[in-house]
Amino acid sequence: MVLSVPVIALGATLGTATSILALCGVTCLCRHMHPKKGLLPRDREPDPEKARPGVLQAAQQFNVKKSTEPVQPRPLLKFPDIYGPRPAVTAPEVINYADYTLGTTEESAAPASPQAQSDSRLKRQVTEELFILPQNGVVEDVCVMETWNPEKAASWNQAPKLHFRLDYDQKKAELFVTSLEAVTSDHEGGCDCYIQGSVAVKTGSVEAQTALKKRQLHTTWEEGLTLPLGEEELPTATLTLTLRTCDRFSRHSVIGELRLGLNGASVPLGTAQWGELKTTAKEPSAGTGEVLLSISYLPAANRLLVVLIKAKNLHSNQSKELLGKDVSVKVTLKHQAQKLKKKQTKRAKHKINPVWNEMIMFELPDDLLQASSVELEVLGQGEEGPSCELGRCSLGLHASGSERSHWEEMLKNPRRQIAMWHQLHL
């Protein structure tokens, strides 16, 4: 037992020494077999023969040669062809057209070098599609006009025309106006157009109109007009066909009208024909501006909504004194001649075209709507002093023109906002 401790210590020492020697031997053997494995990649010398292809190293070696010689363009470089319109007028400034040739007064020069010939070919290809400047170096203004269109030019100056056909049904006692077509000039205003027909007799008049169609130079309607007319009234009746336009603000205007006697002598029945519309001269407006507003009625809530949007071209005798001051609109609800309620919009700075965008609401029973009306007054007022009336208008069945038609459209289309322009008067 006493000798076992030294023996164990000696064995452990010998084992440790043997392990260290074995590790050193293995390390030396590895260094001998791979002498460059321990070096960094940048310290290794590339071996072209043993190099293997990889992602960052190609399998083939390329040699790049640097040269300081200038790169010259190819002598046969072609420019893209430029196509232009054929000139409407013969002019010496325009060349390279099949029917026009340009003579040269200079004699041909001596043959040049190949490089000069290449440059001349390039210059010739470019200048064939360009303009020749005058010799004095001054470039005159060239007026470019679009292609002349005879049909468009004729339609600009011609009067509007209407195509129609008249037929009469004796059993139904009705007059039919079919094959409706309209030809108008390009400068007529309005986005949409329609035809309104009316027959006037001794006892009164009846009227009908077509649907709105997108206004074009040549507009065609697939539908016709049906007007009730007794056979005994046919010889004395007068038919009026009116071509009207309607813009995006629901403003209606007349392009022209055609009046025909139905006695059978001037207008044969059953024959299609063209008629020239007579345009009425526009009288100068005596108003003081226009106002744009929309109205609608809510039957479930018994409410009348009036939206004051804006006005334009406001002027009066006192307009110079009211510049820079406030402008408002007073809205009055009336039933027949009795005033029910009145409200006023906010004030806007007095300009030629003021904008409000304000809604005014009135409570009005449905049974009173037919006999009611709305009166508008545009007022201008300064910081001190009384207000001045700039214009007024009244909407209702008692009115005429656009003021009456606006109220009728509101009655026909409940719960729908309908906007129109109205002329102001003093």
Curated annotation (Swiss-Prot):
Major localization listed first in the record, in broad terms: membrane
SUPFAM superfamilies: C2 domain (Calcium/lipid-binding domain, CaLB)
Keyword Ribosomal protein attributed: no
Topology with respect to the bilayer: Single-pass membrane protein
Keywords annotated in UniProt: Membrane, Repeat, Transmembrane, Transmembrane helix
Membrane-side (Cytoplasmic) residue stretches: 30-426
Keyword Lipid metabolism: no
Cell location: Membrane
Stretches that traverse the bilayer: 7-29
UniProt xrefs under PROSITE patterns: C2
InterPro entries linked to this entry: C2_dom, C2_domain_sf, Syt13_C2B
GO cellular component, one term: dense core granule
C2 domain sequence ranges: 158-275, 287-422
Pfam family for this entry, one: C2
Recorded domain comment: The first C2 domain/C2A does not mediate Ca(2+)-dependent phospholipid binding. The second C2 domain/C2B domain binds phospholipids regardless of whether calcium is present.
UniProt function note: May be involved in transport vesicle docking to the plasma membrane.
Family: Belongs to the synaptotagmin family.
Protein name: Synaptotagmin-13
Organism of derivation: Rattus norvegicus
Name of the gene this protein is made from: Syt13
